[in-house]
Amino acid sequence: MPPIELSQTQFEQHFGYASQQTVFAPGRVNIIGEHTDYNDGFVMPCAINYGMSVSFAKRDDSIWRVYAIDINETDAFDIKKEIPQSEDKWKNYVRGVVKYIQERCPEFIQGADIAMTSDVPMSSGLSSSAALEISIGKTCQVLGNLPISLAEIALIGQRAENKFVGANCGNMDQLTSALGQKDHLVMIDCRSLDISPTPVPQGYFIAIINSNVKHDLVTGEYNSRRQECEFAAQFFGVKALRDVSPEQFIERAAELQQLNELAYKRAKHVISENHRVLEAVEALKANDMQKLGVLMGESHDSMRDDFEITIPEIDYLVELAQVAIGKNGGARMTGGGFGGCIICLVPNEKVEALRKLIAENYQKQTGIQETFYVCTASDGVRVV
């Protein structure tokens, strides 16, 4: 059953009456621009046709009752009182967003019954957490008729994940889930929050292949990567690595390498990756899919060798995909790293060959069964 239908039927089953409204927030996949968002850089993701559905109804008090359908767990808290952190991680995503919505809009004290479900695979690098944050943020906005923009909801979602959940993520995932556009990739400037939509190339599909090796950003090495980037930014005397051009990096690279080898490698990735995103925009405008494929390949190599966030299973998937796709199109790891998914921009006529090559080889080599999704670029959060 699709998530929208599921959240509505399960709401009624669980609470004993029908929900009033439903919000759907999509997951996202990033075509290029990895670990650049928290360096104030550029990214090029799209919202996907998988996401989080939240069905809800107003209560006549200030209690929130939350039913997480997929794990069959519940939460309850009073939003007129201080909202405490929970030992259950999923509850903190919901509580954190509500808490920071209230900081922005202190008048928000509307209680609600909520049932939520997602078809974004957890810990896959497709932003199941951002879809949850944005769907809850939009739910608050609708419940209280609050005067907040989608971009603000995105930044509140990021803040909840940073401060309340404890994952030091950037803002790309939340911005994409909030502001995605159907049939478009969105180039986001993570400093100014400017968004430039670019149509998905005609005759191409977005294929996502999940390695089914799970990652966890809170306990993973994500936070240490962020610290290494901040060290490099301080070395260059700038606010963020976005402010260092490739030429400036080359000029002082040897000095940084001597001082801190890891910071050197991380900076090399971020600075070159920012440049690749800008080149990718130009390649798409020119419909130069060969160039885009080269950029995606360079991005993957940089994540593997300099940012050191790929794993053998992911590298193997990318190798297989590159063989199947050929020169027109590309493949790379997508998401935070240490598992998760690869993304492929693949000509329509090669989708089945790609699926077949991976089905014949990946499990044989790794002992793990992959999951293959063909996605469409979708609109951001919406009331359905």
From Swiss-Prot:
Binding site for substrate: 34-37, 222
GO cellular component: cytosol
Secretion signal, residue range per the UniProt entry: none
Keyword entries, A-Z: ATP-binding, Carbohydrate metabolism, Cytoplasm, Galactose metabolism, Kinase, Magnesium, Metal-binding, Nucleotide-binding, Transferase
Alphabetical GO biological process terms: galactose metabolic process
Site (Transition state stabilizer): 28
A Pfam short name: GalKase_gal_bdg
Catalytic activity: alpha-D-galactose + ATP = alpha-D-galactose 1-phosphate + ADP + H(+)
Subcellular location: Cytoplasm
Gene3D superfamilies: 3.30.230.10, GHMP kinase, C-terminal domain
Molecular function per GO: ATP binding; galactokinase activity; magnesium ion binding
Positions of the catalytic residues: 173
Residues at which ATP binds: 123-129
Family: Belongs to the GHMP kinase family. GalK subfamily.
Protein's name in the database: Galactokinase
Taxon lineage: Bacteria, Pseudomonadati, Pseudomonadota, Gammaproteobacteria, Pasteurellales
Name of the gene: galK
